[in-house]
């Protein structure tokens, strides 16, 4: 039997982090024992069926409880270590008020989580995101000596960088979802980080999706789809503007946007542009429904941007799902996206925050569907070669075996 790995994630279940769920399931299929330690155990209106079996297994530690108080009292028996952990954590988060406040809340429960992991025989910790999960992994490592690793994604290294260098340097290894991320970290932290950073993509299971040729016939409604939470860096306003341009050009279309978040401002844009019944905000959907909706579409769009604060994508898993479904992809040329959407090879790239360029490229997909589908087939093949779940999890498992 393989060693027991503790997975730390910010919140569970979380609809937009299905890729972590898939990774844990695949590791278990490979014989690893996985213990889930979410920092927040939350209720959601839509929960993937695969997540249901993990909910009762989650080792959730409340922020304040008798057990947390007891664990801290025990830790105080070594006052110098206790004070040093508090001092270093608060000092390294001092320039980020939000992180400082959250660190003060997470620190007490980290002592109890460390106690539980020792009792459970955890041999290694893997944290998804270099923010709060990595902080707790680092704290437990300092308390117990249990090694830890981190998967870095996007906002956790591009924007929220409090204590980032410490968390990365003390990690046994780092898994980056893109080459872009690895080079970014090497430039930010130093070349030593590059040496222990490995490319582990957030993979998909291609067989989950129906990959078939779907060419829009002349006069047929052009079915566009996007999947992603309604956050500013996803660029949905530019997609709506592009749809308005296409509509003004006389192209009959429907654009379905799947994802949770506030819809008020986007709905207002849709009404002002006269796109009611053309652009549909469908809210969060379970994975099987996402797969079904992809199978009824002609083109996938990823209009992501870089926000003024620097927030941007890593490599959206939704693009992988769209490619696995055989869809042509139009995306913006930011962060790690060009590693998947290779211009005129596996898809189309346009500048971010440019609705006219986005509309022009979508129009080309509509008017030349044969070429678009040639790229779609190449994209589907690339996903199967480099972004398939099992092969990426095998690379991660190999790193665990080398500990």
Language-model-derived ranges and their functions:
Residues 319, 324, 328-331, 341:
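Short hydrophobic beta-strand element within catalytic cores of glycosyltransferases
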Residues 227, 254-267:
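Glycosyltransferase donor-sugar binding loop
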